[in-house]
Amino acid sequence: MSTKPSLTLKRRFNAPPAKVFSAWTDPEKLKRWMGPGEVKTLIAESDPRSGGRYRIVMRSPDGEDHDISGVYREVIPNEKLVFTWAWKSTPERESLVTISFKSDGAGTLLTLTHEQFFDEAARDRHQQGWNGSLEKLEKFVA
């Protein structure tokens, strides 16, 4: 049995867990930072409860739209989010994202694990995308 590729990213933010968590669950806040580099989030919908759904539509600089959606599997306010992640273009390639938010003095230690990728190329693209998004989140919550 082969294991599907995964990635784990850790980052410290100079903001309390409640502020960082809210940036992930409030649609208006999500629009301000989600997406790497010059990618813009056009649509953000979020119902952050177990069984609730979310949807994000991002537009890349070339004008192409990227539609992602999923279901929240676990929501512990200011501590943990677990949700499925599927691109509209390849819904059969659903993956799973787990984010933990831990208090660190006046800041937050965030650990993002994204697993069950279709292949290593998909993992590598997502790693680049998540790193770019987390850089924007860092500026947003500062």
Regions found by a protein language model. Name each.
Residues 42-84:
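Glycine-rich portal/gate segments that line the openings of hydrophobic small-molecule binding cavities
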Residues 80-132:
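Beta-strand/loop substructures that line and gate deep hydrophobic ligand-binding cavities in soluble
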Residues 8-14, 47, 57, 71, ...:
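Generic structural detector for well-ordered beta-strands
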Residues 14, 75-77, 104-106:
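Structural motif
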Residues 134-142:
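Short amphipathic alpha-helical signal-transduction/dimerization elements
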Residues 20, 30, 54, 72, ...:
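Hydrophobic pocket/interface hotspot
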Residues 1-40:
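Hydrophobic ligand-binding cavity/cleft-lining segments
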Residues 8, 65-70, 92-97:
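Short, surface-exposed coil-to-beta transition loops
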